[in-house]
Swiss-Prot record:
Keywords in alphabetical order: NAD, Oxidoreductase, Tricarboxylic acid cycle
Gene: mdh
Stated name of the protein: Malate dehydrogenase
PANTHER family: L-2-HYDROXYCARBOXYLATE DEHYDROGENASE (NAD(P)(+)), L-LACTATE DEHYDROGENASE
NCBIfam families for this protein: MalateDH_bact, PRK06223.1
EC numbers for this chain: 1.1.1.37
Length: 315
């Protein structure tokens, strides 16, 4: 049986985390792609990880390269390449530089791995997913952004610590843009089947919601750069769902054509991920307050997309 193949563009912190977690699960062989100036680094990272596999018990083969021809036949291509956030920077500060990078990568993916599913992580990820979709020419089910799995994981972490329960018992839901305007939906969040509103006081939940929104910035302020392990694990959750056709209900950034009243934009919503990529958008019933919050985040994403449509996507 032919092994699955995963290509990861960008061998930085998040690319490494994604590769290591995917290799540990033996999801498929992995190609780490980076710039020519970083090719030896990517080769070294891949070799170091591969030498760990006999001890770990995985048969994953890894290679590092700067040659996009090496991604031929990839089932999933993850785009992590881009300029990382530094303290004081917003994701939006990165938009012009990273849009050029993502556009170039997506065009190469379309050339060398035309049947793959693209998962975008590069920030600001909602608008970068839109760039990848347009630059690749892929159908909307094969270009997905990662934000909600990570944001929900942070939400679950903070809630579980406050409740004093297992992380695994907390089921959460975060919609909207990947930034300060994301919308953690407390109504759809529970621990062991019990609504979290029955387990924690409102002020505690409100503080956790705010910490979740600032979760990425908290890591940046502590480490001086973006997170790597949690985003990598979130990506692997999505990769696994696609490669193994698991039909997982996961929050993902999807191209919307009328859902929630939004058109021609990419935004974090609940989705079904399986062998066909993003197979379905699940549209939740929202309260007026929740919809207003979602609209606020969507407008920020819309503004960036319109800027990109008038700029780099018009070239």
């Amino acid at each position: 049986m032919k092994r699955k193949k995963i290509a990861i563009v960008g061998s930085g912190f998040t690319g490494q985390g994604t590769a290591l977690f995917a290799a540990a699960r033996d999801l498929g062989d992995i190609v780490l792609v980076d710039l020519p100036a970083r090719e030896n680094y990517a080769k070294g990272v891949a070799l170091d990880m591969m030498e760990a596999m006999p001890v770990y018990g995985s048969d994953t083969r890894l290679v590092g390269t700067s040659d996009y021809a090496e991604i031929a036949g990839a089932d999933v291509v993850v785009i992590t390449a881009g300029v990382p956030r530094k303290p004081g920077m917003s994701r939006e500060d990165l938009v012009n530089t990273n849009a050029g990078i993502v556009k170039d990568v997506a065009e190469k993916v379309a050339r060398y791995a035309p049947d793959s599913v693209i998962i975008v992580l590069t920030n600001p990820v909602d608008s970068m997913t839109y760039v990848a979709l347009k630059a690749s020419g892929f159908p909307k089910n094969r270009v997905i952004g990662q934000s909600g799995v990570l944001d929900t994981a942070r939400f679950r972490t903070f809630l579980a610590n406050a409740i004093g329960c297992s992380f695994q018992d907390v089921v959460g839901c975060v919609l909207g843009g990947h930034g300060d305007d994301m919308v953690p939906l407390v109504r759809y969040t529970s621990a062991g089947g019990i609504p979290v509103e029955k387990l924690l006081p409102k002020e505690t939940i409100d503080a956790i919601v705010e910490r979740t929104r600032k979760g990425g910035g908290e890591i940046v302020n502590l480490m001086g750069t973006s997170a790597g392990y949690a985003p990598g694990m979130a990506l692997v959750e999505m990769i696994d769902a696609i490669l193994n056709d698991r039909k997982r209900i996961l929050p993902s950034i999807a191209y919307l054509e009328g859902e929630y009243g939004y058109t021609d934009m990419c935004l974090g919503v609940m989705t079904v991920l399986g062998g066909g990529g993003l197979e379905k958008v699940i549209e939740l019933d929202l309260t007026d307050e929740e919809k207003v919050a979602l609209d606020k985040g969507a407008q920020g994403v819309r503004n960036l997309i319109e800027m990109l449509k008038a700029g780099i996507l018009a070239q």
